[in-house]
Structure formats: C-alpha cells, structure tokens
Swiss-Prot record:
One of its GO terms (molecular function) is metal ion binding. NCBIfam families: hybrid_clust (TIGR01703), PRK05290.1 (NF003658). Binds 1 [4Fe-4S] cluster. Keywords: 4Fe-4S, Cytoplasm, Iron, Iron-sulfur, Metal-binding, Oxidoreductase. The gene is hcp. PANTHER family: HYDROXYLAMINE REDUCTASE. This is Hydroxylamine reductase.
Length: 549
C-alpha cells in the first residue's frame, strides 16, 4: 500500500499499512487495480473514438470507476471485486469492437500493451496481488518523485472531474469532451513515458475541462431543482421521526423526499447536503426540516447521537461504530461492508428503519443559517455590491472554503474568519464552511457579510461572481479586491484548484498543508506561474491581504 491522495496522509508522506481514512491495504490494492483496469478500457475507448465510435456505457463505467477510488467512497472489497471483473469483461468486448472497426476500415489494429492486457486473477487474493504490483511505490522507484507526483496530480484532478461528471450524468447532463479527455489522460498515463512538460500541459488542460464539468453540474442541479435562493435553514431539530442524509447527491435526497411524503418522517441534511435547502424544488417539501451536525469528519459522534437511520450518498463515509452501523444505509457508488446497500433508489428499508426508531423526543434549540447564495442570487444584488465597493463600505472579498478535516491546523480557517475586519465580505463553500458559519458576521451595506455559496462544486458560483465583478469594474479577476483561501482534503479539491488555475487566477492560499504528491520542483513551477502559496499565520496573511488591524 502506498497512498498519498488526500491531505491527511500519514506523516505528510503516504499511508503504507492502513489508510488514515480507514481503508485497508486490501481495499487500497483493489482500488489501485481498478485504476489500472480503467486505463485499459480507456486505451481501447480512446482509439475507438478516433475511429468515430463513442460508447457512452464505457464512458460511464470509467467515470464511475474513477469516482469509486476517491477518498471515502468505497471500503467494500466485494464491490470492488465485482467492478474489476466487470471491467475485464468490458475490456474484452472493447478489444473485439476495436478489431472489428479496424477491419471494416481495412486498417491494422495497434498492438496494445500494459493495462489493456491485464487478466483478472481467479481469486480476490490474486486480484490484491496484482493491485499491489500497480502501487505508486513502484513508479516512485522507477522514475522518481517529481514525474510520479505530476502523473498523480493529473490523475487526482481527473478523479475529481469524474466525480462531478457522475453527479451531472445522474441528472441527465453529459458532455462528450469530458469523457474524451478522461480517456486521453488514462491512455497517456498507461502508455506514454513520463515527460514533465507534457504532463504539466495535460494538468492545465485538466483545469480547462474541469470548468466544463463544473458548468455542466451547475446546469444539472439548477435545471432539476431551480436556482438556489437565500434561505434560512434550521440548524437543529424538532420532535418526530427522522432520517439523516449525508454526502452530496441531490437526486437521492429528492427521491427520498418524494417517497416520504405524508409518512410523518422528517428529513435532515448533514455535511455538504446543507446547500440543498436553497433549491426551490427541494425546499418545497415541508418535511425537509433542517440541518443536523457539521462536516464529514464529525459523523462518527453525530451519527451515533442521531435517533434514526442515516443515508450516505456519494463520498465522505467513514468506518461506522457499533452505535449506528445497523442504521447506516448507502446508495450509488458509496459502499461499506458494514452498511446496508440500497439499489435503484428504493428507500423502503431506510424508511422502515426510521419508523421503527425513536426519533427526536422534543424540539431542540432554534438557530438558523442563511444558505442559498448561488451565483444568480449574488449577481442579483450586484449593483448593491458594486456601489458598496465604490463607496468604501466593502474593502475586500475573502473566499474561505473547500474541504474540512481532522487536523488541529484547520483552526487557521476559524481564526481567519473571526479576525477579518467588518469591511470584508466572506464567501464560503464546501464543507470548509463549517469553519466559518458559526461566526456572527452581521451585515454590510444591507447585505449579509457571510455568503454561503453551496457545495464544493459550487466553486463555479464563486468563479461566475468573480468574473462578473471583474467585468463590471473593468479589470481582470486578479485585480479584484479578492483573496482566495482554500482548504483541501481530497481529489475534488484538486479539480477545483486546477479549474481556478486554468482561468489564470493567481495568489491562491492553500492549506492546511500542501499535497504530498507535489514535490519541491513541481511546487516551484506552480509558484512561479500562478503564485500559489501555503497558508501562513492569520496575522501574516491578513497583512498580505491588506486587512491588518
């Protein structure tokens, strides 16, 4: 095992015996092999596309495979084994399709190598052995940390892109260019000798395609559920039966809301599902009552205390405790051997569990958080914002968002939010919002000082707002009174970062620690070209932003 794809990786280097996320060496090896299997599929899919043959079912499988390997998505070796065996069958079908397509065009098929040729072992232990041979550790030995790190920066950007593309596809939105790029990247990683400049070029292209994906998902979410509207959200509970929904998938929540109409079961969001309350087609359900708990890393205590079942959608699942594992349900790609997997969005077992559970005995304390500041909501008050900036009432915008996590160093983001002067407006998104939303920031020029823009993918909203303000002021985005302070944890944050770099956004602060896979020479390139910097102390960073007391 050698895994360094998330921010909390052991010793800031790599997890080598068990993941700090909780995944075992067995699961890590199967995930490494699933990446290799996806590369093998892409080797054929890439060439078939060059012949004018697109295969949406292969696109979907490869994107799902990549999403499966994102941090805290799948801990289930049995599910991973199923995916691997399906990948081998699909690869054989693709080989036959490719050979037939070449024959029909009277051309000779290329002789492929590497992942295109892998054969699944007959046992799970054999698959694990094959996966271990595909470990990052072997590439580090063969080609060194710099080239390996660039390859993995690209791979992790594509993993996050795949996650967002999967969410969009669930809501009926796809884009051919996304799958085409993914197949190109995986084919390159499978076949082409590592070259730093070529890899860096693909990394930057990954950012450009990531913008396409973020736009795609924004259109998918708003097309299905309307444009988010500023909405007060109860941060607590009321008496009654209850289901808690965590993760990111809005369609899972929408279907559950419809299936629980009139049953006397209240639905609560957790973690990054908080922004769901701003969507008109979701908040119309009166039994979408409020938000319970905070960010993903607090789930083991918060789920244990919740008096009903929990539905985990997409990623951010942790190994459950005995206190709630019999109440934990999963759907979609998220998988854990100790949770009950639901298929086809049939939530009847989940609902039955809620009806059998005690629920909340009484109402809790009443506190509200204002969510729903998507780009259309913010741009709807753009004239007020522009006037406030020109009048000097707003001195700076500070985006504090991204992922949250366990480390005590993440208190930096709390402290930064609490130390900002009253003429600074805070934009937030992702589960990093839970580091700032407990601060009472009041208003400025008749507007809330804290604008919650949504989930991590709603970095797209921040981009749209920044572009619109830059146009209104007649300047570039980098000339705006705007500072970006991003907390990262997993691969979707890498995707968002690359999207920002593709727009030419400079001077992004990243923390609490820099990625282990970005070596000093690679970091120097990012610093020289984009001004990326690690977070410092709050006092130092406020001074650099021109916000010192």
């Amino acid at each position: 095992m050698y895994c360094y794809q998330c921010e909390q990786t052991a010793q800031g280097v790599a997890c080598v015996t068990v993941g700090l996320c909780g995944k075992t060496a067995e699961v890590a090896a199967l995930q490494d092999l699933l990446i290799e299997a996806a590369k093998g599929l892409s080797q054929y899919a890439y060439r078939l596309r060059q012949l004018g043959i697109a295969l949406p079912e292969i696109d979907a499988f490869v994107l799902d495979a990549l999403f499966t390997t994102v941090t805290n998505v799948s801990f289930d070796p049995a599910r991973l084994e199923e995916q691997l065996r399906e990948a081998a069958c699909l690869r054989d079908q693709l080989r036959a399709r490719y050979d037939a397509a070449c024959a029909a065009r009277h051309t000779s098929p290329e002789t492929l190598s590497g992942p295109a040729l892998w054969q699944p072992a007959s046992t799970r232990a054999g698959l694990v052995g094959t996966g271990e041979a595909a470990s990052i550790a072997h590439r580090l030995t063969a080609q060194g940390a710099d080239l390996t790190g660039l390859q993995d920066l690209l791979l992790y950007g594509v993993k996050g892109m795949a996650a967002y593309a999967c969410h969009a596809r669930i809501l009926g939105q796809t884009d051919e260019s996304v799958a085409a790029f993914v197949h190109e990247v995986l084919t390159t990683l499978a076949e082409v000798p590592a070259d730093a400049e070529a890899l860096l070029g693909l990394v930057l292209r990954c950012g450009t395609v990531s913008l396409t994906v973020l736009d795609l998902l924004d259109r998918a979410n708003t097309g299905a559920y309307g444009d988010p509207q500023p909405t007060p959200v109860l941060m607590g509970h009321r008496a009654g039966k209850a289901i808690l929904v965590s993760g990111h998938d809005l369609k899972d929540l929408a279907v559950l809301l419809e299936q629980t109409v009139g049953l006397g079961v209240d639905i609560y969001t957790h973690g990054e599902m908080l922004p769901a309350h701003g969507y008109p087609e979701l908040k119309k359900y009166p039994h979408l009552v409020g938000h319970y708990g905070g960010a993903w890393q607090r789930q083991r205590s918060e789920f244990a205390a919740f008096p009903g079942p929990i539905l985990m959608t997409t990623n951010c699942i942790q190994n459950p405790t005995a206190a709630y594992r019999d109440r934990l349900f999963t759907c979609g790609l998220v998988a854990h051997p100790e949770a009950t997997a639901l298929s086809g969005r049939n939530f009847a077992p989940l609902i039955a569990s809620a009806l059998a559970a005690p629920g909340f005995a009484e109402d809790g304390p009443v506190r509200h958080h204002l969510a729903g500041f998507g780009h259309k909501a913010v741009l709807g008050v753009a004239p007020q914002i522009i006037d406030a900036v020109k009048a000097g009432a707003i001195r700076r915008f500070v985006l504090i968002g991204g992922c949250d996590g366990h480390e005590s160093a993440r208190s930096y983001f709390d402290d930064l939010a609490g130390s900002l002067p009253q003429d600074a407006v805070v934009l937030t998104l992702g589960c990093g919002k839970f580091r700032v939303i407990d601060h009472d920031m009041g208003t400025i020029a008749g507007l809330p000082r804290l604008l919650d823009m949504g989930q991590c993918n709603d970095a797209y909203s921040a981009i749209k707002v920044a572009q619109a303000l830059a146009e209104a002021f007649g300047v570039g985005v980098n000339d705006l009174p705007l500072s970006l302070v991003l907390s990262w944890f997993e691969q979707k944050a890498v995707t968002v970062l690359l999207a920002l770099l593709a727009l030419g956004v400079r001077n992004i602060r990243l923390g609490p620690n820099l990625p282990a896979f970005i070596t000093p020479p690679v970091l120097k390139v990012l610093v020289d070209r984009f001004g990326i910097m690690p977070v410092g102390t709050v006092a130092e960073d406020l001074a650099a932003m021109g916000l010192a007391a």
